[in-house]
């Protein structure tokens, strides 16, 4: 394992770094690739695209999916679009502008070189997906259509109505299936990685649980790729699929992979508000809706009270009595400010008492102006399925009344630390997509998650991993009877036995919900020193309750979702604590991390570049010992660092 953080960022001009790095990387002869085995954990956009591409190159790939099909990956839930710098709208977009918007949107807490590479390969992603048959929306003349997303002033987002993630995943899934049929990829559905196996300091395999039979199984390889997404479900209520978890990444952390910027969690501004105590998941309404929808609350408190009592409808409030607060506060960007800015603005209005539902935690997203301007057919073409989804959930038609929305946990910018090659601090272990921290800094721009996942999977990892594997083809296949596999399996079995032995009375979900309440209260949209210290204490207290009183019914050797959830909750406790610890250490406000002690007179985020312009990479020590913080300084040579301004 590396003794310090070596990012491997090439020297030279920004636009030449990726080309230079590719020229330095070693290659693997096509005939030697078939001698090499690669494990890919996760089958969302990052994992599916990586496995398909590596298989097509001739490597022997084993791909693992916790669901019955890659089509169930959470990538399928992405709605609004994918960014690419193609300048199809002739609005002065460019690779540099996408790079600049991403750095600025991330509040100057991401690497220049990684972000520029992401922008550089973005156009190739669209070409690849079109070749796969992804049905992107098109203009009248047949050209691919674009729309805008938050934090930008150009239209660079390619989309397929409100189902972009689904269509992109089907394209990657088709490519993956082709390689499965060709025999280069072996698929393991309903398998969950529970530990990473290290031999001689290198990642050599995993221990996975067959979720159908309950059996622990061993898998060896020359390299391991983690593509399991983020850890947003630490909060219990989030927009993530309920199966989404951070356990695979967390087990890598506990085996020596540094975990970077865990406190950077994104809160999405356009989600359907919480409906009641029994809710276990939140529903995202696409950011694309902010293209044409206008966000507002009433100006008069009397109107707010009437709305809460259902005495009036939103459409009955006159235009002059509506506060379009984003347009008022940020005239240059209006409703298309970045997500962290829009979320805090909604919280501010609701905290001031202007929330429009019974709980006081909702604002309006109104399409009446767009319907008048564009007509019913155009709006239906762009947002029809989203309108239908909202109606099915709320029994309110967005054609007649505004949607009600409120911020919710959505994405995590933090993740496993990786270098420029996407390799972690453990040789042979790579992390891609949302599982790593690489590209988004303190806040991700909308439509950039799909871009990063496919960039890593199609165009970056297949090139960089060859450098590591170039001298491995002469090595024998990993022996799964190695003592390291014995120990890893024994450790996993001990975790399972411990959970079954508790025989308590509280359900896993009830305890997870309490953890989520702690996280949302103290590590949510507004954080303070006092609250974060309280969070760490309460998380550990709740963890003690879990190990004393949790009930895990059933048996190991059967389909047992309660056991699955209990194993993940063990990790969520530790992830939540590290998030709070990282947030406590970062005594500044930047992106999705907002410390109440560090804000301007107007309530905007106040960065501390002198003390916190670095990537915080945490190293696990051992149980009961605090992790060690390593700092990777961030240097900006090709962009001017300044306070984000979305007002003019």
Descriptions of predicted regions:
Residues 34-36, 214-223, 425:
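Core beta-strand elements of the Rossmann-like FAD/NAD(P) dinucleotide-binding domain
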Residues 67-100, 266-270, 278-281:
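Conserved N-terminal glycine-rich FAD pyrophosphate-binding loop of Rossmann-like flavoproteins
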Residues 42-45:
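Glycine-rich Rossmann-fold phosphate-binding loop(s) that bind the pyrophosphate
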Residues 251, 258-392, 463-466:
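An anion/pyrophosphate-binding glycine-rich loop and adjacent beta-alpha core
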Residues 125, 130-215, 220, 227, ...:
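Conserved redox-cofactor binding core of oxidoreductases
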Residues 223-278, 282, 440-463:
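Glycine-rich loop(s) and the adjacent beta-strand/alpha-helix scaffold that form part
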Residues 19-20, 25-28, 32-37, 50-53, ...:
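Glycine- and aromatic-enriched mobile tails/lids
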Residues 108-112, 145-169, 232-236, 363-377:
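Helix-loop-beta segment of a Rossmann-like dinucleotide-binding subdomain
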